[in-house]
Amino acid sequence: MVRLKKSTGIETLSPIHRIDRETAGLVAFSKRPQDRNAYQALFRDKSVKKIYQAIAPFREDLQKRFPIHYQSRIEESSVFIKMHEVSGDPNSDTWIDIEEVRGQWARYSLKLGTGKKHQLRVHMSSLGIPIKNDQIYPVLQPHVITNKDFSEPLQLLAKELSFVDPISGLKHHFFSSQALHL
């Protein structure tokens, strides 16, 4: 954040939402402190359409179920930094579809209905298709807590954001130029 403020010269720059540190792609920022809450409210109120891409194993037995509307209840687990599914009313939902298949891997489109911590990672892992290079799901790798290893990045990309601007009323649709390749 410090480097971004220095490179743009905008000291008031602040993120209006969060993505996991390991996730690549779009993050929206607010320049004016007086507008920040209005933009953050869009995310709190689920008024932002968020689309991600992920590379994960292809499972032929799931192919006929796509698109899948996956819902579950996600809560913090007893394991540091890890979330898990528990019984109860769903508090998270994701639409999952296949974009492309190449051998044992597929690129998936993930549309968030909610934005729980690690939601996409938990949902994909629960379906038996954990995101490629995920060092937390399904099994927490020992070095994750003490030493972040980015040599094999998580194959999860925040690809699109769209919303109606709460200040101007204009419709915005932002795309990441990054892409995940099979």
How would you label these PLM feature ranges?
Residues M1-L182:
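RNA pseudouridine synthases
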